[in-house]
Amino acid sequence: MSTFFAKANAVERKWYVIDAAGLPLGRLATEAARILRGKHKPTFTPNVDTGDHVIIINAEKVVLTGNKLDQKMYRRHSGYPGGLKETPYRKLMQNMPERAVEHAVKGMLPHNKLGAQMYTKLKVYRDENHPHQAQQPEAWTIQ
């Protein structure tokens, strides 16, 4: 018996919706990255995108434990000398909670072209409204 290798065009993709209300950011991001990679499937193949689509709702209600809201910084750089921009997570969660969740999930995906392809299947929304009802997403619960 030979080892099974998934083919990219033979993968059936489902849509899952995760409610982020009251969940720690790290646990939410870990589970979302697991689904995006396809590690929950028996047909997981590391070099093929076998993952499913993930919709995260209620991003503004995600929880950061400890003092991370005040101490953790979101950093980005313009590419120019002195171009480092720092934003505390408290301000980021007030203005753009979607970006905080996307940043956490992206850091848990592979840092290559395959990871970029997986990242395109992530959709994050501030509240419970999302435009993907036509895809009939299944609810995914995190303990």
From Swiss-Prot:
Keyword Ribonucleoprotein applies: yes
Molecular-function GO terms, alphabetical: mRNA binding; structural constituent of ribosome
GO BP field: negative regulation of translation; translation
Keywords: Ribonucleoprotein, Ribosomal protein
Record-linked InterPro entries: Ribosomal_uL13, Ribosomal_uL13_bac-type, Ribosomal_uL13_CS, Ribosomal_uL13_sf
GO cellular component, one term: cytosolic large ribosomal subunit
Assembly and oligomerization: Part of the 50S ribosomal subunit.
NCBIfam families: rplM_bact
Function: This protein is one of the early assembly proteins of the 50S ribosomal subunit, although it is not seen to bind rRNA by itself. It is important during the early stages of 50S assembly.
Family: Belongs to the universal ribosomal protein uL13 family.
The protein, known as: Large ribosomal subunit protein uL13
Protein species of origin: Desulfitobacterium hafniense (strain Y51)
